[in-house]
Amino acid sequence: MQPLQNAGYDRAITVFSPDGRLFQVEYAREAVKRGTTSIGIKCSEGIVLAVDKRTTSNLVEATSIEKIFKIDEHIGAATSGLVADARALVERARVEAQINKITYSEPIRVDSLSKKLCDMLQMYTQNGGVRPFGSALIIGGVYDGICKLFETDPSGALIEYKATAIGSGRSAAMDIFEDQYKDDMNLNEAINLALTAINEATEHETTANNVEIAVIKCGEEVYTKLSQEEVQTFIDEVVSEEESEEESEE
């Protein structure tokens, strides 16, 4: 039996509850919280996007699971939540990037793309016959040498971050960022920090098979996904550092 205060107000997306809540939007946020962990970090040398893409079965081909997407040459996105919803948002973002390039003969700005996407997300919270997207995105990119990192929300809210996380491991990851993030860290340090956060969120079950990492360097402004071998090298570094810290504490 549903709580009396929720009765009737969680059925229609366009109806506020007496205390000013849209329950369908809150339920969409819960779908994001149940997703795997995705990380975004802005550093002095560029943007790092990292995701946990663990599967529920050994029969699933790991290469078929995609949680990081290339939006444009200089922009990438990491997702969490309902996979199909995330794919639809990514396709819309790609279309917006293409429209901007055709119309203005230049790449789209990271903040402009993020705002356009969130404008659409917001429309899905106030129209009948639709539902909010049960997915959130971390959008990162470099434009004119300036790094930008944004987090979207099913409500259409848009927040710029230095480092952020979405999904089931958000709390653990954000605690690590609060403690270890530095504005002047280089790309390798940012990758190690992202892996440390994912390792904590996954209870130290991180492997090159279930982690995906993409970077966008300030100088090049080109989205690049790391190979499994490169990811494993960084994982080995993180594990080695954690073991050294444990030994020093003893």
Curated annotation (Swiss-Prot):
It holds the Pfam family Proteasome_A_N. Keywords: Cytoplasm, Proteasome. The keyword Cytoplasm applies. It is found in: Cytoplasm. GO terms for biological process: proteasomal protein catabolic process; ubiquitin-dependent protein catabolic process. The 20S proteasome core is composed of 14 alpha and 14 beta subunits that assemble into four stacked heptameric rings, resulting in a barrel-shaped structure. The two inner rings, each composed of seven catalytic beta subunits, are sandwiched by two outer rings, each composed of seven alpha subunits. The catalytic chamber with the active sites is on the inside of the barrel. Has a gated structure, the ends of the cylinder being occluded by the N-termini of the alpha-subunits. Is capped at one or both ends by the proteasome regulatory ATPase, PAN. NCBIfam families: arc_protsome_A, PRK03996.1. Component of the proteasome core, a large protease complex with broad specificity involved in protein degradation. Belongs to the peptidase T1A family. PANTHER family: PROTEASOME SUBUNIT ALPHA/BETA. This is Proteasome subunit alpha. It comes from Methanobrevibacter smithii (strain ATCC 35061 / DSM 861 / OCM 144 / PS). The gene is psmA.
